[in-house]
């Protein structure tokens, strides 16, 4: 795809997948800013960022920017869902959610990356100054960030962290493979619409559309469909373009 066409598609698609079309960040601005500040200032989060660099690369489908945004949004969801609970506890659980967000795709794009990534995550955080239960919550969240989760006999902190990670990840499934930056954190360098991508768009869109009913948290159930719809609007726009306008 030529640079001029990339720029044109970006201009066309930006209004469809902009922050303005997703009210989550506006409605929970205080919590989002708190999570974002925490992400950039907390020493343990900083340590985790350095630890995962060997596993996350800009040219992968699940890249550094995806991990970053999922981590911040998982922390935000934890703070939003925990309103009315002990603030100190929820800040700590927000930390766990952010670490899980950074780690969740360290073995992507392997088909079994959630399970294998959980094993690697356990090794990475083994020396972190966290309680055993907290480390288990991170590993549990990484292992279960893709599929439906049974709530039977699972420690509370595991569910809180796992649900926040799951929903934050799904927020961005429909956006991170589209050619439009969401705020300052969407990657701009990924190949956008090569031949393989064009062939996959309809099936991918159906898969993503089905995700609207799979969010686990109350906040995710309310706001998740906005993310889904923003990504779908962009995908449908690209799919409707003549192939000779999209392909190099």
Where are these regions (language model features)?
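An active-site-proximal "capping" alpha-helix that borders the catalytic cofactor pocket
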Residues: 70-77, 113-128
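His-Asp-centered metal-binding catalytic motifs of divalent-metal-dependent phosphohydrolases/nucleases
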Residues: 70, 90-117, 138-147
